[in-house]
Amino acid sequence: MEQAIINDEREYLRHFWHPVCTVTELEKAHPSSLGPLAVKLLNEQLVVAKLGDEYVAMRDRCAHRSAKLSLGTVSGNRLQCPYHGWQYDTHGACQLVPACPNSPIPNKAKVDRFDCEERYGLIWIRLDSSFDCTEIPYFSAANDPRLRIVIQEPYWWDATAERRWENFTDFSHFAFIHPGTLFDPNNAEPPIVPMDRFNGQFRFVYDTPEDMAVPNQAPIGSFSYTCSMPFAINLEVSKYSSSSLHVLFNVSCPVDSHTTKNFLIFAREQSDDSDYLHIAFNDLVFAEDKPVIESQWPKDAPADEVSVVADKVSIQYRKWLRELKEAHKEGSQAFRSALLDPVIESDRSYI
């Protein structure tokens, strides 16, 4: 079947794992708690369902008369089309045509299926597994019994995933977009930190200024970033106020060329306070960011944007994205090398 038209500059993103929904969203989509649920990734219209013990992602288009399978139902271990009842197995092959039960099923009666897994309470999809060198992004709190983990409701922005990533990792905007909320406006000059590439991740550390007048919910402390390319950010905060660990895991789904569905999971060591205080604080911070990031135009960063030394993180990020785009054109080995070859600036050891 045909592939959705996407910008050639973003074709390489098909090789990465992206979250498309929470498990809760899928369970709420149908009384069975199994789906199906319509989702969109890189302009591909997809359907997600749980068939037996397996989470499955397919193109959301029946091979028969092109009805959306996401309007259908789960029948046993199969996904049933709402129009004529054709049933598809976990591999996307049609196993039942009710109108012709005694006739051979045509060989073309199948739909494209894609890699699909559940991790951290999110459903992840990889559209192209041919290079097979990417993994679901790293979330440091996933298996830490000390931490309470909360999955927030996804939030949508009219912005690219690249712009969202840059916003989340931008040190010099704190004093201007988040004065009194997340940062002290008198601390407008951030340090220039060494950045390492290792195992398909950016890793860097930023020690925020101490004794800033911010709310207790503000995760201020030593920031340790582990950012799995291209759009995931794992931020571990060793909080100054309580000497405890707070983790933010933010990852953006590139829905199409201008829309981003964002997922935030947070975890904290001290959990005697209400989850809702932290959820409300995160929502407040994002509400401060959103209108500014959505105002950026064009949506994709143009080459004539002026950068300064304080923009090191976004400069290095854009450089790596360009390298991945070019390597993708050369094939699997070049892409693997561009993604996984280490580039170390700091004195940290990764052995």
Swiss-Prot record:
Its EC number is 1.14.13.178. The keyword Oxidoreductase applies. It catalyses: caffeine + NADH + O2 + H(+) = theobromine + formaldehyde + NAD(+) + H2O; caffeine + NADPH + O2 + H(+) = theobromine + formaldehyde + NADP(+) + H2O; theophylline + NADH + O2 + H(+) = 3-methylxanthine + formaldehyde + NAD(+) + H2O; theophylline + NADPH + O2 + H(+) = 3-methylxanthine + formaldehyde + NADP(+) + H2O. Pathway: Alkaloid degradation. It is an enzyme of class 1 (oxidoreductase). Keywords: 2Fe-2S, Alkaloid metabolism, Iron, Iron-sulfur, Metal-binding, NAD, Oxidoreductase. Its cofactor is [2Fe-2S] cluster. Transmembrane segments: none annotated. Pfam families: Rieske, VanA_C. PROSITE patterns: RIESKE. Optimum temperature is 30 degrees Celsius. Residues 17-125 form the Rieske domain. Disulfide bonds: none annotated. GO terms for molecular function: 2 iron, 2 sulfur cluster binding; demethylase activity; metal ion binding; oxidoreductase activity. Optimum pH is 7.5. InterPro entries: Cholesterol_7-desaturase, Rieske_2Fe-2S, Rieske_2Fe-2S_sf, VanA_C_cat. The keyword NAD applies. [2Fe-2S] cluster binds at C62, H64, C81, H84. Involved in the caffeine degradation, which is the essential first step for assimilating the carbon and nitrogen in caffeine. Catalyzes the N1-demethylation of caffeine to produce theobromine and formaldehyde. Also catalyzes the N1-demethylation of theophylline, paraxanthine, and 1-methylxanthine to 3-methylxanthine, 7-methylxanthine, and xanthine, respectively. NADH is the preferred substrate. This is Methylxanthine N1-demethylase NdmA. It comes from Pseudomonas putida. The gene is ndmA.
